[in-house]
């Protein structure tokens, strides 16, 4: 399908040629002196002239048909056809005339194609302006996004730094409190241990004194018993000498009763010593119980203290790293 402009140009050229032919025919009619044989009818032209006019008309039509072929010689027919069919490459600068050879008035839009006749340069300029505006908007959006992102990151870093500082202060305070508590606890334990040792020494001394006193008492009792036995023996000997053999039997029975009383006294003394030893052992156990509990508590507190010291050291290292990074950012 050919473009509309070319069709019109061909029609205009054809109409112009027909007008020239009719003008030539009129000139021949006026110049011929042959009258018409019928009234009211034009004069007949000679046969030779008719043939010459037909030949001239055919020649002109052949020239008109050959004109587009000459125009497109040396071009790619497929590409040329695409260019002819492309409505965006057409312009209104072609010579557009109607069938009577008059130029049609210029219109904003082509009635047949419906394509805006604005120049491609203006369209390209508008497209470039729109793209430039879009690029500027994208740049502005990117700058605003970076700014907000940096502000948010700074706020988060400040918040994290404050939190770490607060944790570091609390850990330091807790460490000081724990150290003071452990020191006081150790002092109390040492004082209690000293008191317990002094009490144990006193109890041991008292037990030794009691044992020594008991031994002295036992020795004195034994000495007294020996004296009494000697006196009794002397008395018995004297009585035996006086009274004779019957009384000797009675003296033997009295000696057996004295031995039984001595055995009972020894058993009572042993029981008293055992009771004193048991009481002393119970007192030692009572004194040793609080010291054992305190030592157990101290053993439990030591690993907790070590863990706390380790955590404080880690927080201190983190605080130093963050403060150094913040200083470097401020320098940059």
Swiss-Prot record:
Q: What is its main location?
A: nucleus
Basic residues bias locations: 1-13
Extract one GO BP annotation from the record: spermatid development
Distribution of this protein across tissues and organs = Expressed exclusively in testis.
Q: Give the subcellular location.
A: Nucleus, Nucleolus
One GO cellular component term? nucleolus
* Designated name of the protein: Protein FAM9A
């Amino acid at each position: 399908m050919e473009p509309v402009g070319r069709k019109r140009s061909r029609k205009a050229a054809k109409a112009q040629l027909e007008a020239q032919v009719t003008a030539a025919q009129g000139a021949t009619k006026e110049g011929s002196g042959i009258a018409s044989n019928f009234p009211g009818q034009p004069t007949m032209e000679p046969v030779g002239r008719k043939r010459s006019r037909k030949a001239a008309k055919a020649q002109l039509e052949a020239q008109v048909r050959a004109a587009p072929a000459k125009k497109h010689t040396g071009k790619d027919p497929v590409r040329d056809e695409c260019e002819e069919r492309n409505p965006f490459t057409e312009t209104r600068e072609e010579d557009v005339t109607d069938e009577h050879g008059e130029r049609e008035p210029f219109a904003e839009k082509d009635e047949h194609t419906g394509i805006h006749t604005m120049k491609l340069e203006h369209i390209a300029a508008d497209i470039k302006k729109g793209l430039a505006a879009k690029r500027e908007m994208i740049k502005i959006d990117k700058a605003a996004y970076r700014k907000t992102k940096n502000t948010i990151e700074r706020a988060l870093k400040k918040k994290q730094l404050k939190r770490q500082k607060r944790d570091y202060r609390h850990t330091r305070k807790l460490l000081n409190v724990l150290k003071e508590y452990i020191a006081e606890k150790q002092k109390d334990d040492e004082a209690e241990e000293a008191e317990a040792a002094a009490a144990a020494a006193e109890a041991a001394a008292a037990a030794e004194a009691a044992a020594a006193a008991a031994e002295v008492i036992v020795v004195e009792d034994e000495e007294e018993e020996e004296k009494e036995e000697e006196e009794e023996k002397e008395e018995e000997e004297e009585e035996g000498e006086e009274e004779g053999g019957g009384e000797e039997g009675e003296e033997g029975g009295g000696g057996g009763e004295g031995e039984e009383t001595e055995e009972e006294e020894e058993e009572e003394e042993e029981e008293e010593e055992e009771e004193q030893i048991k009481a002393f052992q119970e007192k030692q156990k009572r004194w040793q119980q609080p010291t054992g509990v305190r030592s157990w508590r101290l053993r439990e507190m030591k690993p907790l203290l070590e863990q706390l010291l380790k955590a404080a050291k880690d927080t201190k290292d983190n605080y130093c790293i963050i403060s150094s990074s913040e200083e470097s950012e401020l320098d940059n």
